């Protein structure tokens, strides 16, 4: 795949942090992308270019870095925005979806009225790793009767198999490692 000069500039700003959050992990730090206004704009513009013709009516941002991309994308698309959060963080009645971790379980919630039947929904997060969190949010969306259009990420860590779990045809990432 040929990468645009803009995405090459974005890739150059993502730094590797070895042994974070634990030994043996190389963390992809996106904060330099966010700190540079030109690079951040390139990212949002690339997301908008990909989704502008898909009639997205709602964008769901996944806690917490997904919020950073979902909000400006929803605004640019003229779509609504909602957020998927960890349990106990949303103030209204919620629906919950549990997903498995390597050692245990976690869950995410949406407000019960955040996504409605018939809406066309895009789920957004910063990084796709194993796909567990995104898959849980996708299940929340479809349980409400909405159409899950796709998942969109800044970065995909392809070696962790998240795209396969979500269904490769439903996954979009600006950058892959």
UniProtKB/Swiss-Prot annotation:
Enzyme class: transferase
Origin organism lineage: Bacteria, Pseudomonadati, Myxococcota, Myxococcia, Myxococcales
Pathway stated in the Swiss-Prot or TrEMBL entry: Purine metabolism; AMP biosynthesis via salvage pathway; AMP from adenine: step 1/1
GO terms of biological process kind: adenine salvage; AMP salvage; purine ribonucleoside salvage
PROSITE patterns: PUR_PYR_PR_TRANSFER
Protein name: Adenine phosphoribosyltransferase
Cross-referenced Gene3D superfamilies: 3.40.50.2020
Annotated compartments: Cytoplasm
Entry EC no(s): 2.4.2.7
Pfam families: Pribosyltran
Reactions this protein catalyses: AMP + diphosphate = 5-phospho-alpha-D-ribose 1-diphosphate + adenine
UniProt superkingdom: Bacteria
Keyword line: Cytoplasm, Glycosyltransferase, Purine salvage, Transferase
Protein family membership: Belongs to the purine/pyrimidine phosphoribosyltransferase family.
Organism: Anaeromyxobacter sp. (strain Fw109-5)
Function noted in UniProt: Catalyzes a salvage reaction resulting in the formation of AMP, that is energically less costly than de novo synthesis.
Subunit record text: Homodimer.
GO molecular function: adenine binding; adenine phosphoribosyltransferase activity; AMP binding
An annotated GO cellular component: cytoplasm
